[in-house]
Amino acid sequence: MSESNNMHVSGDGAKQSVYTEKKRVKVYVLENNEWKDTGTGFCQGTVEERTIDDTQTAEKMAYLLVVDEDSDDQVLLKSRLEQNIEYQRQEETLIVWKDLNGQDIALSFEESIGCDSLCEYICFVQKNIESRISLVAVRSTDDGIGSVHEIITGPVNLPSNVPNQTEESLLEALKILNENTSFDYLRNETIQFVINDHYLATLIRSFYQSEESKLYRNLLLLSNIVKTLILFNSKEILEEMINDENFLCVCGILEYDTEFPNSKLNHRQYLKDKEPNFKEMIPISDPTIKLMITQNFRLQFLKDVVLVRFLDDQSFTFISDLMLSYQNSIIDFLQEDSNNFINQVISMYKVEEDSTVTPDKRRDGIKLLHECIQLSQNLNSIEKTLFYKFLIKKGLFQVIQFAFNMETNNDIRILATDIVVGLIEHDIQLIQSVQSDEVTLLNDENSDIDSTDMSLLLILTKILLTDKSPGLKEQSFQALVSLLDPEDYIVDDYQNHDDNIDTRIDNMLQIQNGKNHDGLDGERNHEKFQLAEYLQCFYRQVAPSLFHCFIDGSVNLYECDQQLLIKLVKLLNLMIQGHEASISRRFILENGILIRLISLASSDYILQLRLAAVRCFKNIVFLNDDFYLRYLIGKNLFDPIFEVFKENLNEDNMANSTILDFLKSLNTQLKVVEQEDIPLSGSKSSRNFMLLNKYICGRYGDILLKADYVSFTREMMAIYHEETQKLASLSTTETSFDENDNTTLEVEV
């Protein structure tokens, strides 16, 4: 706000300057608890300057002046803005206050713009002439019952900034800072004080003095002060904290914690050991980007390590958003062709014989690319996809091939696998673009390019089967799960990447049984065709190696790694439930995999593996597939299942519960058939379950009868006897699964 040209000298010799335009207003005063209208006029903000005789210094005094609208000579109000008067702006057009004489005064403006003008004038006076006055906005709450006060301007209590801080001054500073977080105005004024008056430097100086003198109470107070400053959620304060000069000191202050007053963390030592490991493999020409990389690391260290127990949701989000702004800038820089940064990294893996590129440098390159992937995790989906496609197009998979085929360092191979997992979890269809010159989800129908390259699956299979690192095995397993999950392949924005494999299989079962099923429209037909081609290649090129221990009868499963067998059973379960039966079933049955699978239910193996085998077996049964059921019954593959049941018949454990759950599910299906009164010669669905019940009750009835503590085993036996009588009356001795099928199954009892 600037002084207008309207200036004159009053009768007492004071110079009067006008700071606002005239605004029409009504003046009210409170008398006997009622507001009295004292007239309508024009209000202005004025400043009078007088010379004090004793000191010959100029003194400025600010006034709210209202003159009558009909006569400029008649003053309706002249009120000085002084001392600790609080002005309240109520709603849009009202300013209310109590002067030093105790008189309540209100100005009601004709337009809100007039009220705005006078509020700006009050702010000007508070900043430049009378710092003790204040202006507060008062607004009604949404429910109309209460009111909300917000400071617009006013005196701000600030911490002492003297060089030598005492325990008392630090305690007072902490109190003031906590109070100043209550209102935006106080918060903003405090932020300006911290930045402009270099308050952080004062705290750091006090920290060194206190640590040297072992003033532990001061150190704890300093830690709480810095934490409170972080809660101001100011980019300026945070960036000052993480600059080269202050970061180590700030972390040192935060090593002290009032929750653990008798101990101290060692953030500074960690940083001294860690920060020298920052390597600039490829020179970064932009100093701003170099600074952002450092700032991003330091903010992440504060957020995830130093302040992990302290940050509230708002501050956590604020720091995360600030990091995201850095990360976006860094990712944008990496994608700029002009700086050639990624090209220089990828080129180290294109010529293996290049003696100028050392193995350590190639390892550092993989670490760098892994950091790039990690850096992109918080980007939105579209930006992340564009960045991943950029990396793939530049040759990311050449780096991964090197890591899997040439690198022997386990840590580096784990990082490479983590890169693959990150790509898969974001968008599995990116993997299908590896062999295409253009990074697209799928090749054109008329393209000669093979979109079903299995090299990545073969690499992951090799790692899963042969690598000695448990971490690498687990990552390879998760990558295979994602690559073999048809839901990931078909659904664009698949949201269940964090689901474990058992949850995925349950979802598939629901879809198979008609639940949770949205269907696929015609636009996805091409994707389904590509999926079928992809899976056929998998069963032809990869599955024989992946399930070699199940296919080769000479392999003693008991000598295999049982944790690996659990993973293979889960993958098998995924394939059986999720892949087209016409593709997966042939591979599984022709290679006798189910025979080896069910042998894992025996007592020779750990319980977790036995239960995984039983669950897989159960899921096969409830596919209600004619071919599988014929095979299972014909080969008597239920024997190991009921052997486990017999062993745990009277036990309250997972083995018993798992098999009881299988029997209960079968009984539920039988009840549905019975309630619908479907004859044995009815639908395939009904006949399959009735025949399965006949087989189970006939072969394992003695075990079922001993499980008399549950009702459904008795119900299964009752249905079995009833159906046996019906068959006897019909003189039927053999049953076909299909009236038009020449294959007849002798049900063994």
From Swiss-Prot:
GO terms for molecular function: protein phosphatase activator activity. It comes from the Eukaryota. Gene3D superfamilies: Leucine-rich Repeat Variant (1.25.10.10), Pleckstrin-homology domain (PH domain)/Phosphotyrosine-binding domain (PTB) (2.30.29.30). Pfam families: EVH1_PP4R3, PP4R3. Keywords: Nucleus. Core regulatory subunit of the histone H2A phosphatase complex, which dephosphorylates H2AS128ph (gamma-H2A) that has been displaced from sites of DNA lesions in the double-stranded DNA break repair process. Dephosphorylation is necessary for efficient recovery from the DNA damage checkpoint. This is Serine/threonine-protein phosphatase 4 regulatory subunit 3. It comes from Kluyveromyces lactis (strain ATCC 8585 / CBS 2359 / DSM 70799 / NBRC 1267 / NRRL Y-1140 / WM37) (Yeast). The gene is PSY2.
